[in-house]
Amino acid sequence: MLIFAAEMDKLHIFNPEHDIALASNLTNFTAPHAGRQLRADLGFLPALWADEGDYVLVEDADYAALAYRRATKGRKCRVEWVTKSQLSSLSLLSVSPWGWDSALRHQLLRYGVDASLLPSEQQVAEIRQLSHRQTAALLLPSLRIGGTVGEAVFCQSVAAVEQQLSLHPRLVLKAPWSSSGRGLRFINGQLSEYHLGWLRNLLTSQGGVMAEPYYDKVKDFGMEFITDADGTIRYEGLSLFHTVNGAYVGNILATESAKLEMISRYISVDLLNIIKQRIISSLRLGTYQGPFGIDMMIVRNNPQLSTKSSQLLLHPCVEINLRRTMGHVALSLSPADDDIQKVMRIDYTDNYKLKIRKL
């Protein structure tokens, strides 16, 4: 296999175990089996958005090439597949992973990637701190305008959680760092012994827990962004996705105008545009540069609120994912024709596969 270093200067990495690695905060982190298999089976994903001639790190180059062809129905591959044994011999100008964490940084150093291409330990620590759910909680007040809902409180004791329960009998507790669908507990009225054990463990391991009122969710969706080196935030597009028990299932592939039409059946497009502009002007992400996504949801109005009971409200910042998301993947596959609409799913039988079907 011939590699022309002068033409290929960016290395892309799909490390879906990133969220769990952030929570562990270990340099010698070992991902759970499901995370390792997801990375092995879908390591080709960066080829969907990489530039021609870029490298994509995979475990098996032949398997990645085959999986890419199957997923894209024969779309021409423009990248070079590489394995970890080749990294020390590559001439690179930049590295672009799914998300930065301490474990990935140390892996790449062990594989021979130049430290100057990687964020410093201090920068990785900053990314981890910004990935704390408090970042979303701090952004929320600047997004709370008419037609919106949402609050979150960081609790550092059982008593603080019980105080929130006295205000909101139905509560959602969230680990400060966790992957989709994990680290969530739904509390109805009081803390059980099971919940107390989970909570005390979390208070010890992560220093606290996020407490949020339970909302009657109608629809999940998100907005995808990229932040540049100078801190400028650019909007990339809407992400209309589906979850089951908090875990990602699939994304709609459609033009931005088609997605706006779909979401306008629930809430005002003008409201969405205002929220988008407030995110761009209000969110501060330090030295982080790269893709990120903000999960949102449409909820039925809580009868305790002083608004019409039939009203649908926007929760504008459920979570901030300071990494690439499946929404970004969907944007890289979205059609240019308003009449073409598909759905992208991650299916699992004996392995993970990216499937694209007509909607």
Language-model segments: residues:
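ATP-dependent carboxylate/phosphate-activation module, predominantly the ATP-grasp catalytic core
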Residues: 225-278, 321-347
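Conserved N-proximal alpha/beta basic substrate-recognition cap immediately N-terminal to
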Residues: 3, 36-45, 57-160
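Short, basic, low-complexity termini and linkers enriched in Ser/Thr/Gly/Pro
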Residues: 1-6, 87-92, 302-312
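N-terminal "leader" segments that precede or initiate the main folded domain
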Residues: 4-66
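Glycine-rich phosphate-binding loop of ATP-grasp-fold ATP-dependent ligases
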Residues: 151-152, 171-195, 222, 245-262
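A long amphipathic alpha-helix within ATP-dependent nucleotide-binding catalytic cores
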Residues: 206-208, 235, 246-313, 352-359
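ATP-grasp fold ATP-binding core
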Residues: 155, 165-186, 207-217, 294, ...
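Phosphate-binding site of ATP-dependent enzymes
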Residues: 169, 194-247, 297-301, 310-317, ...
